[in-house]
Each structure stands twice: as C-alpha cells, then as structure tokens.
Design a protein with these regions (language model features):
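Cofactor-binding beta-sheet edge motifs in enzyme active sites
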Residues: 2-398, 414-701
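Divalent-cation
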Residues: 403
C-alpha cells in the first residue's frame, strides 16, 4: 500500500460515533474462550490422517439432532483464504497436501460428543507416495546475491586458495519455546445479518476482506472484536483468519453462536511450530584476519503453500552476513515446499537463525586463526567498499570497546582457549575442575522493513488536540509501558499533563488497517510517528483553531533508501545493535551447565526510562536461556545490561537478545568442551558423546 501524504490537517476531529459501523474494536483483557452463550455450539476441525492423496468419500451417518458436519462443499467456490496473493483452501475439497490438513468441521452442543462422532466418520482416500520435499529443483521462493569483484563461480573458487584460511561450518537452529498463551480460535454470532467475530486476530483487515468475499457480506455487516492475542508468529497472523472463517460458517449455517478452540497440540503443530534451518558458510580468511570472501547457502523447508516463505527467506539473507564488510559475498537462499504444515516464524526475531550461523562462524574463525573475538570483528567492520546492504550501526566500535574494558573478555578468552586446547577428555579420568568457556556474539535488530508491501512501513499514526486541551491518540492498544512512553513523549512536546492524553483504539469500517497488528505495534516506528504528529500539532496550535488533527506516515523518499527490485540498499528504517558476552562452566562429573554471567551492551538510541529498559532486557535474557538446552531450564543470577549513550530516536530492544544470545552460548559451550557445538537447542547427550570421542575439535577447519 503506498504511503499517504506525510502530513494531514483537519479542522474537525474524528470522534468515533455509535452510528458508524466498526471494523475493529478492542475487547481488552478478555480471552475469546471465556465467552459463552445460551445457544452456543462447539466446533471441531476434522483433519486428514494421510500425508498425500485425494479424498474419495467422507460421510457421517445418523448424525444426532443438533449436530452438524460441514465439508468444502458448504463453502462453494469461495473455499479459500487469500493471503499476499496466495490462495489457501479452508477445507480440502479433493487433494491432500499434508497430514493434519483440515477436511471437515463437526459442530454440536457437547464437545465430548464431537470426539465420539469424529471416530464414526467414514473416510476413503487414494494415497500417493510423498517425498520429504515436493520439487527441490523448483524452489517455492529463492534469492541469489553475489557482490564484489568475483562475479563468476570460478573466480569465487580461486579466493579459497591455500594462501588463505578456508573455514567451513554448518549451523542448525530451531528454538520452539513452550507457549503459555491461549490456543487460537474464534467465537462467532450471526444475528440480523450481522456477523460478529471475537477472536485474537492480529490482522483485522485481512479477516474482514476474506469474510466479506466468502460469505457475500457487506462491510457494515462484519464486526470484529479483538481479544487477547496469542503470540507474534507468522501463522497466527494469517491462519487465525482461516480458523475464524470456519467458526463463521458454523454460525451462519446453524444460526447459533459457534466457538472453535484449537487444542494445545493443534496450536503448537499448525500455528507456532518452527522448522530447523541449516545454514552452510564458507569463509576465505587472509592471514591478517581480513575475510576476503564468504559463501552462504540457506535452505528452508517452508511447508505447504506458505504465504510468508519469500518474506522469511529475504530476512534471513539480509542478516546472513550480519554487519560485516566482506569484499566478495555470495548468498544462495532457497525455500522449498513440502508435505508438511506451513512453517511459522516469530515476527520479533524472524532472522535469528541467520545470526546464529554467522556469529558461530566468526567464533570458529577465531578458534582456527587465533584472533580475539573483538579484534576479528573490528578488522571486518566498516571497510570502504560497496556492499549490498547498509545499516545504521552507530557506535558499534564503542560497544565492543565497552565490553572489553568492563568485562575483561580478551584475557578470559585466551585463558579458556588454552585450557581447552591442552585438555584431553578421558571418560575414565575426569578432571576435578569445571570446564570453562566464554562466548561473544553481536547482531542488529532491523526496525521498519521496507522490503515488502506488508512490512513496508505502511503504518500511520493519528493524533488530535481537542478544543478542551486534551490529546487523543488514535492507535491500536500498546503495552502499558509503551503507552506510558507515548504519553510522556507527547506531553513533553505539547507541554501538557500526561493525564490529559487518552487513547482511542476503535477503528471504523472506513479506516484503513491493512497491515497486521504486529507491524502497527512496532514501538519504535509508532513512537517516531507520534512524535512527528505532536511536533506538527505544536507548530500549528497557536496559529490554527482547535481541534487540530495530524496524521503521519512514512514518505516515499524515506522508503527509496531500499531498492526492492535490486534487493539492495538500506532495508530498515532504524536498527538497534547489541553485543552479548556469556560465560559458563560445565561440571565434569554431572555435565550440568552453569551460566556464570551474561553481559550485554546495547545501542538502542535514547532510552526513555532506563530502568524499565534494563529490566526488559534481563527478562529477555532469562527467557532466552530457557530455550537453549533440551529438557533443561538454564538461568543466570549475574546479568549486567549497559546502554550506549545516544541522543538518536529510540529503537527496538525487543527481539535483540533472542538474535544474539544463542550464538554466544554455543560459542562458550564449544570452547568449554573443546568440540564444535553447531546445533541448537543443545542435547546434553550430544556434546557428552562429542567430548569422549575426541573428534570434531573447535580448532580444526
């Protein structure tokens, strides 16, 4: 969606009137599964038991009164949800593409009866053999980058000559954090031709447009009440619409209130489960530590018909070389379809697996060449030649300098490296002192991605200074801490009391809310736009009569810094940067991992409330630690967080730790064990076997 004009002035404010049909209304602090009605019926999704094939027949005989079975035929020709120009069947009409694909809906007043009825459904399928990947020679999405003097394959090969270090690594990661959120679903009523949907939607416009088309309803006949969201994953953004459409069909066809709640297993398997990504990196490193060339191969199993596959792949490519200046870069990235559910990614750290790979590769280069972590990184930062991607990396050197001065990283790194090199692990003769390691990792968090229509900074912020001196902010409901930042920001610019500022989170059908909530809710972007609104109002308030309304969005000039066709330039509106140092010990008898300390230095612009920001980062660190080892919840009592002083606009802190801490952990673990740990989450039995085998040393190429 093209950005609208950056400024807008209106003489009359836009209060939400009761007679204006509403597209979106927040139902705060309410879970949809807590809603109930006297004539409510439950809905259960019937899923395919086969992986690949066709439905020959699907019948249920002797359906009790008050119970219903719905199939694809009940949707007619509109049996699909459209997302980013990709059509996904709501219920399989014939072809089956993955095990668990929805094929029917059961509805009735007693949920346990639905479980019994499901067992009585007679299903006949024509099965086909299903390979793991559908067609590997035809990727579902792909991206190829080659930058530098070496433009031909043979020229690239020459860079990996004997005079340079030729260092290869394969890094695999997938962190599926346990979800404590409500399982997804919807609560729908259809009364007097008005469809009301209560659901944890994160993309109300997407839901509304699909509902209108599928059921032939007018805009004013669809009312969406947003309940508490279930997490910022790509599948929860668009598949919530699929689920809400299913519940809506039941409500419309039966005339009863319909509730559809996924089971905890369904919510994980089909909405939030992520897929492992293996990234292969080959680095040509000169004797002076300069990385002359890097080759990266990213292969992603995106599942069946994933509308976000290209988006995910592009973000991985952008992060694949981190902030480093390498003269010759080749990145090949491919996403393949498979006979599995569409893969989901966490929007807040969509590129974390790329950072895990490149930062572990940097640590491996340190191990092989003997350079120190900060020394190697600074040798390959801000070199003067053209790169495909540019980032706002102010004060990166200051961050590394602060880490070394404050935490004595280099001395510990050298000491632990000597211990590791000289240690010979013998299962019959364990040492009586802990195995120690220290890991360093860095990375950025790009805010406001210009690379696609849906994540292309299409956000808008509207603020109105009313006649009575109060300020109304028209935006989606943010977190309590973010709202406090907004009020303080606006109050300071307009010189009013924060108590005079109120939030309006109701959007009527005539207002455009075309991008997902996760995009609108980006704290840094929306705070920036609010600041611009307030500055605009302040410049006019003594020359124009109140009320004054200002609407701000991103200008075309701001978006032109990224060339979408050439896939080059500055991909983000803002970037935050962070460095993490993690120190650990391993008990030589129990092989239990003890996190001694975690140190983080972050550059996130001007920090409004430092204590809140510090506590937020500490919570992020503790949360990230719980995901690193299978069946273990690591924690740390010694966490230190520092912020680089800056007067720039504040940038995003959330998601930064989850991008860089995993690599710091595996780097430290590799040093402690003396063996390369290239997969996360870590299985304790895996590194135990590695250690006693005395193979796969971190000091080999």
């Amino acid at each position: 969606m093209p950005a609208k004009k950056n400024t807008a002035e209106k003489k009359i404010s836009k209060p939400v009137k009761k007679d204006i049909p509403q597209l979106y209304s927040p139902l705060l602090k309410t879970y949809f599964s807590d809603l109930t009605s006297a004539n409510m019926i439950y809905t259960k999704i019937v899923r395919s038991p086969i992986t690949k094939g066709r439905i020959k027949s699907l019948t249920l005989e002797d359906i009790p009164e008050g119970y219903f079975l719905f199939t694809a035929a009940d949707f007619g020709e509109e049996n699909y949800v459209e997302t980013l120009d990709i059509q996904t069947e709501i219920l399989a009409s014939s072809e089956i593409y993955y095990k668990g694909q929805p094929i029917a809906l059961l509805a009735g007043p007693v949920f346990t009866d639905l479980l019994d009825l499901e067992k009585n459904i007679k299903m006949e399928f024509e099965k086909d053999p299903a390979s793991k990947i559908k067609e590997k020679e035809y990727p579902y999405a792909q991206r190829f980058i080659r930058n530098g003097k070496a433009q031909k394959p043979e020229e690239f090969t020459k860079l990996f000559s004997k005079k340079n270090y030729d260092i290869k690594g394969t890094w695999t990661s997938v962190l599926n954090a346990p979800s404590c959120n409500e399982a997804n679903g919807a609560f729908c009523t259809f009364d007097k031709n008005i469809l009301t949907i209560s659901t944890p939607t994160q993309w109300p416009k997407h839901l509304q447009e699909n509902i209108k088309r599928i059921f032939n309803l007018k805009t004013e006949e669809v009312f969406i009440r947003k309940t508490i969201s279930s997490g910022p994953h790509t599948n929860t953004i668009w598949q919530n619409t699929v689920i809400a459409v299913m519940a809506s069909l039941v409500a419309i066809k039966t005339g009863k209130t319909a509730q559809l709640v996924l089971s905890r297993e369904e919510h994980f398997e089909y909405l939030i489960k992520k897929s492992p990504i293996s990234i292969k990196i080959r680095s040509a490193v000169k004797k002076d530590g300069i990385i002359e060339a890097v080759q990266v191969l990213i292969e992603l199993d995106s599942g069946y018909h994933n509308p976000f596959a290209a988006e995910i792949l592009d973000r991985l490519v952008i992060a694949a070389n981190n902030i480093y200046s390498v003269r010759n870069i080749e990145i090949i990235a491919k996403a393949y379809e498979s006979y599995t559910p569409p893969v989901s990614f966490n929007i807040e750290c969509i590129d974390s697996q790329a950072f895990f790979a490149i930062e572990n590769q940097m640590q491996k280069i340190c191990n092989v060449t003997g350079f120190l972590p900060d020394e190697l990184r600074m040798k390959n930062f801000e070199r003067k030649f053209s790169l495909p991607f540019t980032f706002t990396n102010e004060k990166v050197r200051e961050a590394f300098s602060a880490i070394e001065k404050m935490y004595d990283v280099n001395r510990k790194f050298i000491s632990y490296r000597m211990e590791s090199k000289n240690r010979k692990i013998d299962i019959k003769n364990l040492h009586n002192f802990p195995l120690r390691g220290i890991g360093v990792a860095c990375g950025f968090n790009g805010i406001g991605y210009f690379g696609s229509n849906i994540f292309a900074c299409n956000q808008k912020m509207e603020a109105t200074l009313e006649s009575d001196g109060t300020l109304e902010i028209h935006a989606l409901q943010p977190s309590a801490s973010t709202l406090e930042v907004w009020k303080n920001t606006a109050a300071q610019i307009l010189e009013i009391d924060p108590k005079q500022i109120k939030l309006n989170s109701i959007f009527d059908v005539n207002e455009d809310l075309s991008v997902p909530e996760n995009v609108y809710a980006n704290v840094s972007v929306m705070t920036y736009l609010l600041k611009k609104c307030c500055q605009d109002i302040q410049s006019k308030r003594f020359r124009k009569p109140l009320p004054i309304t200002s609407t701000k969005g991103f200008t075309s000039a701001q978006k032109k810094v990224w060339n979408k066709e050439k896939f080059s330039g500055s991909p983000f509106f803002l970037s935050s940067f962070g460095t993490v140092v993690l120190e650990l010990e391993i008990n030589p008898y129990t092989y239990k991992i003890y996190i001694k300390n975690v140190k983080a230095v972050l550059n996130a612009g001007k920090i409004g409330i430092p204590k809140i920001a510090e506590n937020s980062v500490k919570l992020s660190i503790q949360h990230a630690l719980t995901e690193l080892v299978v069946d273990e919840n690591l924690h740390c009592d010694q966490i230190s967080v520092s912020f680089v002083q800056s007067d720039n606009d504040p940038t995003q802190i959330d998601g930064l730790i989850s991008r860089i801490l995993p690599a710091a952990f595996t780097s430290a673990l590799s040093q402690a064990t003396g063996h390369e740990i290239n997969t996360i989450p870590v299985k304790p039995q895996h590194f135990f076997k590695e250690m006693i085998s005395n193979e796969n040393s971190v000091y080999s190429k």
